[in-house]
A protein has these predicted regions:
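C-terminal motif of bacterial Sec signal peptides marking the signal peptidase cleavage site
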Residues: 14-15
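Sec-dependent signal peptide recognition
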Residues: 1-7
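Beta-propeller blade termini and top-face loops
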Residues: 19-631
Length: 631
């Protein structure tokens, strides 16, 4: 086996001739008119699986029993439903940027909607703010915002719909911004990276609340002219890990009692740092919950996976009977975090972390109970990783056409959109028990094409397509846009289909975790029979690392019994079709330079003696000759 290393110096390649490149770059309009319109594409689906969604709004304050909804997928753009989420339609999936992170509606004109792009806590750069004046039929870019990388939150002033506030961050134009002309021009009213903003109407004046990343809560009682730090400190430097407690924050104020507000903060590790409450419009704040890494305190699991962290009583046992350190990687409050207040009751507070939690006692210590479960098929199931909660505009009112008091709430997460019609019912104080949760949810994702595929494979006969999704498992296509079946859960990653036998498929979970599937499809009913087992246990991950989060593997295109994968070493199996998955063996072909893992592997389709491997962040590419002959 011969290895040739090719080093690409990105500074030279991309740095040279920048002016010539920029001047010759095709415009969005030219690309749209020349290539996209001349190519016919059909949406294969899945139409029954939703993807990561960080924003949702409900049109207007009507008394209709059926809501018109708008949802922003982080891939896919803005979708609209006119039947309460039973079906969805993409409004404009050819916008220059479809990474929608936040939505806001003009309170005086339902046809005017703002969409902020760029996902600060997901890694996708945006292109500022887009606006529609015809309920989503057409969208235009607000030009003076186009250099904003991450638009984290947009709020239209409740006093004057000409005034808009935007919390923004990133290397481009960043800060807490204000527009007084419906988004035509923008002014920074606070320069720190801003990740959330809330606005309360107090006697005709906008009280503005912003959360500055790592620095904490800022408050203005004069429409943003002057700000005061209320929680945290202006002296903390961005990404200062010596004082890592004020990482991400979320703000919520009560609709029924506007003087009441809450602040949720996670630390740099993604754990709950604290919850604060104000009862005087933000003049004073009291910390009601303090996690502070003390495992004896309650509520330590609010922003974490309750199956993997200390339970509500701090006794060190996780839900599956084992013990685990509180600093577990499943603490991810910097990725999924939200706080909101019941519109009819200022004491009822919802928190979204990996799961949903609710306090009926004004966020007092020990008062948060579990309100959903991310596994199983019970009525309390909601997909993991919560991002947003929106209540019906008529929440808490008696609805003659609805059949009682409106308790509808919509929840967005990594699985799309869910709705509950009884969101005020029972919760449980035990994070490891869910049978007593009374809140029931329904998944509403038909037509909501917002999934994020990491990788996919097509069978040689074109009959099957298998793909790995972000947090939605591995899906198998077998006939139509509605005929997609999940064959593995969690995060889906790389996939392959045996070119000689399309009923044999391979999928992977995060890191090096490869499975072999034997698939049988009933041609009459479309039912799937899926027998699977892991085949990567023979790879040494303790010495050579667990690989990349989304780790590559590849079948040899000229030998369907041979597979390659990589961590800090390159591995080959010559018997991936062994009678038992436990009999699959692996050979170490050698290590890469440094501590980088293989990121991508490809083999020449006509010559298995030529392989290329892209490695880590070092811009190194390995050309490997005769990999089947090594080591």
């Amino acid at each position: 086996m011969k290895i040739i290393i090719i080093l690409l110096v990105f500074g030279l390649i991309f740095g040279c001739a920048k002016e010539e490149y920029d001047s010759a770059a095709p415009t969005y309009e030219s690309l749209y008119n020349s290539s996209v319109t001349k190519t016919n594409w059909t949406h294969m689906g899945p139409l029954n699986v939703g993807g990561r969604t960080r924003s949702l709004l409900i049109q207007g304050d009507s008394a209709s029993s059926i809501h018109t909804l708008y949802a922003g997928g982080v891939t896919g753009g803005v979708f609209k439903s006119t039947d309460g989420g039973e079906s969805w339609k993409a409004l404009n999936d050819l916008m220059p940027n479809i990474n929608v992170n936040t939505l806001a509606q003009d309170p005086k004109n339902n046809n005017v909607i703002y969409a902020g792009t760029g996902e600060r806590y997901g890694g996708f750069r945006g292109a500022g703010i887009f606006k529609t004046e015809d309920a989503g039929a057409n969208w235009t870019s607000l030009d003076n915002s186009s250099d904003i990388w991450f638009v984290n939150k947009i709020v239209v002033s409740p006093n004057n719909s000409d005034v808009i506030y935007a919390a923004t961050s990133g290397i481009g134009s960043a800060g807490l911004k204000k527009s007084v002309d419906k988004g035509i021009t923008w002014t920074n009213i606070h320069s720190d990276y801003s990740v959330d903003v809330a606005v309360v109407n107090k006697d005709g004046t906008d009280y503005v609340y912003g959360y500055s990343e790592w620095k904490g809560l800022i408050v203005s009682f004069d429409g943003g002219a002057n700000f005061t730090h209320k929680v945290g400190s202006s002296s903390i430097l961005l990404y200062d890990y010596t004082t890592p407690n004020y990482s991400r924050g979320s703000i919520a104020f009560s609709k029924s009692t506007p003087s009441r507000g809450y602040l949720l903060v996670s630390n740099a590790a993604g754990q709950l740092y604290g919850i604060w409450k104000t009862s005087d419009y933000g003049a004073n704040w009291t910390k009601t919950i303090s996690q502070d890494n003390d495992t004896t305190k309650t509520d330590s699991w609010l922003l974490s996976d309750s199956t993997d962290v200390f339970d509500h009583n701090g006794n060190g046992k996780n839900c599956f009977g084992g013990t685990i350190d509180l600093n577990d990687l499943r603490s991810q409050g910097n990725y999924d975090q939200y706080i909101t207040v019941d519109p009819a009751d200022a004491d009822v507070v919802w928190v979204g972390g990996i799961e949903l939690f609710r306090s009926d006692s004004a966020a007092a210590s020990g008062s948060f109970n579990k309100a959903s479960v991310w596994y199983g098929s019970e009525g309390s199931y909601v997909h993991a990783d919560q991002h947003y909660i929106a209540f019906s505009p008529t929440y808490g009112r008696d609805m003659p056409g609805y059949g009682g008091t409106d308790k509808r709430a919509y929840f967005t997460n990594d699985g799309g959109v869910f709705v509950s019609t009884n969101s005020k019912t029972g919760t449980t104080a035990n994070p490891c028990e869910y049978s007593s949760i009374g809140v029931e949810y329904k998944e509403i994702v038909k037509g909501y094409g917002t999934t994020q595929y990491y990788h996919g494979a097509v069978s040689k006969d074109g009959k099957y397509v298998v793909g790995g999704l972000q947090d939605q498992g591995v899906t198998l296509y077998h006939g139509s846009s509605d005929n997609w079946t999940t064959i593995a859960g969690g995060d889906g990653a790389y996939n392959a289909i045996d070119p000689d036998n399309s009923s044999i498929m391979y999928s992977s979970y995060i890191y090096i975790s490869i499975r072999r599937h034997n698939i049988t499809v009933d041609n009459e009913t479309g039912a799937i029979s899926n027998s699977s087992g892991g085949i990567s246990s023979g790879i040494d991950t303790s010495t050579y690392g667990k690989g990349s989060f989304i780790n590559p593997f590849i079948l040899d295109p000229n030998n369907s019994s041979r597979m390659y994968t990589a961590n800090k070493a390159l591995w080959r199996s010559d018997n991936v079709k062994a009678a038992s998955t436990s009999d699959v063996t692996w050979t170490n072909l050698g290590t890469f330079d440094g501590s980088n893992s293989g990121f991508e592997i490809t083999i020449a389709p006509s010559n298995s003696k030529v392989m290329y491997v892209g490695v880590g962040y070092s811009a190194s590419f390995y050309r490997i000759l005769n990999p089947a002959d090594g080591p």
